[in-house]
Amino acid sequence: MSQRQFKVIIIGGSVTGLTLAHSLHKIGIDYVVLEKRDTVTPQEGASIGILPNGARILDQLGLYEAIEDEAPPLGATRIHFPDGFAFTSLYPKKILENFGYPIAFLERRQLLRILYDALPDKTRIHVNKTMSTIEHFTKDEITGARVLTKEGDVYEGDLIVGADGIHSQTRGEIWRRINSSKSEFEPAECIDKCILIEYSCCFGISKCVTGLIAGEQVMHMRNGRTLVVIPSKDEVVFWFLVEKLDRKYTYSEAPRFTIDDATALCSQVFTLPIGNGIKFEDVWNKREVVNMLSLEESCLSTWSTGRLVCIGDSIHKVSIPS
């Protein structure tokens, strides 16, 4: 009798989830990816920075060349302080010299598209699949785990990996099982003690912004507030404005923001200079998409139980100020 092939069920078509899919493919392990949205490349207005540690992994997976084509490397950073002092730092070039890879930014959606397009077998990626229940089972003396979806589908495998982000359902299932178990595991953490919010971030993508040089980042450091503007190729500009909140919030009381909140916050930095006579208001006026979110921070001690494990933001998330 042939041995059954080990199979991994990945919850979440995130950057983490799709990168894991590539890793499993490289070593010949069967897998499926379940994504609750109708696409693995949603437009959320977010950019993503690729640092040398991540670039090295993506290069090993054969993905980095496609990223290089989309993301010009940072070469210099112009940093402004509240007292008017400003200087140009070449730390991005030093990072390239020291580690062999640069810092580079691209649209998060572009990175997801690169990860998805490079997968050899796209039939393993299932969208519109929302996890409902996770079960352990024994069948014909073989044990495993299955995922039931709200859409009525059933997926069976040997390991379930939660790559479903800070609002992870997989993490919730792990904690539920640990709390109901009589094993010697430590009690699962209270989510409000482990996931805290001290900052908000308004972020966006602007297009057709002329006069800025790709790869020359601009930062304005203010008391409790930081604006970062990153010109990219084809007159695209990534930017984000981080603000310290009035207090530290728990996960359950995380502030929610509207487009009016984003506009009100960004209008306070309209006059800040970006370069070549351009002010942030000019970048704002060319915006294509804008979003504003609370920035969660966490580092959880319970990552797994049984055949369930969480990775990425679901168990370890740092905010931009960190």
Curated annotation (Swiss-Prot):
GO molecular function, one term: FAD binding
GO terms (BP aspect): terpenoid biosynthetic process
Matches recorded under Pfam families: FAD_binding_3 (PF01494)
Residue sites binding FAD per the record: 35, 49, 108, 313
Entry EC no(s): 1.-.-.-
Inducing stimuli: The subglutinol cluster is highly expressed when mycelia and hyphae are transferred to fresh media for a 3 hour induction period, remaining expressed under conditions of heat shock. The cluster is repressed in cultures reaching stationary phase or in early germinating cultures, as well as under conditions of UV, salt and oxidative stress.
Swiss-Prot/TrEMBL cofactor(s): FAD
Keywords: FAD, Flavoprotein, Monooxygenase, Oxidoreductase
Cross-referenced InterPro entries: FAD-bd, FAD/NAD-bd_sf, FAD_mOase_fung
Pathway the protein takes part in: Secondary metabolite biosynthesis; terpenoid biosynthesis
Record flagged with keyword Flavoprotein: yes
Function: FAD-dependent monooxygenase; part of the gene cluster that mediates the biosynthesis of the immunosuppressants subglutinols, meroterpenoids consisting of an alpha-pyrone (4-hydroxy-5,6-dimethyl-2-pyrone) moiety attached to a decalin core fused to a five-membered cyclic ether carrying a prenylside chain. The first step of the pathway is the synthesis of the alpha-pyrone moiety by the polyketide synthase subA via condensation of one acetyl-CoA starter unit with 3 malonyl-CoA units and 2 methylations.
Family: Belongs to the paxM FAD-dependent monooxygenase family.
Protein name as catalogued: FAD-dependent monooxygenase subE
Organism per entry: Metarhizium robertsii (strain ARSEF 23 / ATCC MYA-3075)
